[in-house]
């Protein structure tokens, strides 16, 4: 079934006004997207993270009169609309399109991330089967890739690993497949824990080797290896707690950090860790080191 799509170029300050107006005139969905391929920076507390130049996309059922929608929008918002464009688009199998675009990826020397519906390119390699849905990590983001490559380069034999902010479980499961004895996962999102559990089962990881906790339930572990791919703000504020969870001589890898935030995050861990040079990819960085 075809749809009418209306696109507006807006600022973050206009987002709520135009979203409400589009829903008022009958839009079946309203979506915000980046107009300039910018990353979303960490927002202030209690604010909605949006790009400085944002496109708002409103979708209407087939047969909707675009001119009438735009005229009604001007009445509701009290003036001329920002730069806009309307077109009729054909329906697609969005899930199938996404699946077709998610292909096997290699990280380091040994590790492959392979969609569960795809044959492994190297059956004898370390193949992590992943079916994350659309919400959690797949390995395509530079921060996840930096962490996976770091794990691939470590000797994880019989180690105890903590994945803080585990999401899909991709880092913890990779560590287990690379030789870790146990990986503990924690996340504030119950759905993330469920995704981790599902992906562990898909990779034949026994439940006892990958216990999962909400942060307030996390026991006081002493990890050989801690990975945390979250955001710079939490990494800085949680530095004392995360440092205490790594045993002396243990290793740490942190990401989810923009390049300009790297020095501040590194400074929060420099007292307790002998830090490696910061690794940078596409404007994102990884900080790693060994516990003093």
Curated annotation (Swiss-Prot):
Its EC number is 2.1.1.-. One of its GO terms (cellular component) is cytosol. InterPro entries: Ribosomal_L11_MeTrfase_PrmA, Ribosomal_PrmA_MeTrfase, SAM-dependent_MTases_sf. Keywords: Cytoplasm, Methyltransferase, S-adenosyl-L-methionine, Transferase. GO terms for biological process: methylation. The keyword Hydrolase does not apply. The keyword Lipoprotein does not apply. It is found in: Cytoplasm. It comes from the Bacteria. GO terms for molecular function: protein-lysine N-methyltransferase activity. S-adenosyl-L-methionine binds at residues 144, 165, 187, 229. It catalyses: L-lysyl-[protein] + 3 S-adenosyl-L-methionine = N(6),N(6),N(6)-trimethyl-L-lysyl-[protein] + 3 S-adenosyl-L-homocysteine + 3 H(+). Belongs to the methyltransferase superfamily. PrmA family. Methylates ribosomal protein L11. PANTHER family: ELECTRON TRANSFER FLAVOPROTEIN BETA SUBUNIT LYSINE METHYLTRANSFERASE (PTHR43648:SF1). This is Ribosomal protein L11 methyltransferase. It comes from Pseudomonas fluorescens (strain SBW25). The lineage of its organism: Bacteria, Pseudomonadati, Pseudomonadota, Gammaproteobacteria, Pseudomonadales.
């Amino acid at each position: 079934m075809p749809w009418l799509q209306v696109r507006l170029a807006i600022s973050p300050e206009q987002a709520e006004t135009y979203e409400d107006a589009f829903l008022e005139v009958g839009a079946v969905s309203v979506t915000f997207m980046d107009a300039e391929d910018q990353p979303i920076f960490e927002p202030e507390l209690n604010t909605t993270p949006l790009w400085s130049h944002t496109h708002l996309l409103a979708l209407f059922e087939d047969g909707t009169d675009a001119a009438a929608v735009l005229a009604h929008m001007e009445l509701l918002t009290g003036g001329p609309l920002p730069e806009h464009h309307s077109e009729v688009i054909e329906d697609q199998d969005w899930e199938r399109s996404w699946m077709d675009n998610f292909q096997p990826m290699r990280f380091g020397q040994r590790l492959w991330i392979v969609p569960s519906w795809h044959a492994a390119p190297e059956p004898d390699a370390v193949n992590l089967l992943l079916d994350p849905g659309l919400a959690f990590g797949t390995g395509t983001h530079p921060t996840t890739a930096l962490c996976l490559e770091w794990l691939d380069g470590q000797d994880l034999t019989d180690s105890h690993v903590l994945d803080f902010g585990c999401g899909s479980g991709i880092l913890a499961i990779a560590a287990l497949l690379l030789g870790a004895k146990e990986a503990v996962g924690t996340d504030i999102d119950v759905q993330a824990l469920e995704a981790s559990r599902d992906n562990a089962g898909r990779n034949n990881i026994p439940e006892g080797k990958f216990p999962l906790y909400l942060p307030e339930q996390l026991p006081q572990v002493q990890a050989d290896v801690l990975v945390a791919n979250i955001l710079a703000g939490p990494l800085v504020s949680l530095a004392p707690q995360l440092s205490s969870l790594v045993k002396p001589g243990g290793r740490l890898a942190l990401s989810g950090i923009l390049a300009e935030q790297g020095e501040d995050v590194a400074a929060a861990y420099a007292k307790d860790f002998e830090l490696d040079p910061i690794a940078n990819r596409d404007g994102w960085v990884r900080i790693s080191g060994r516990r003093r």
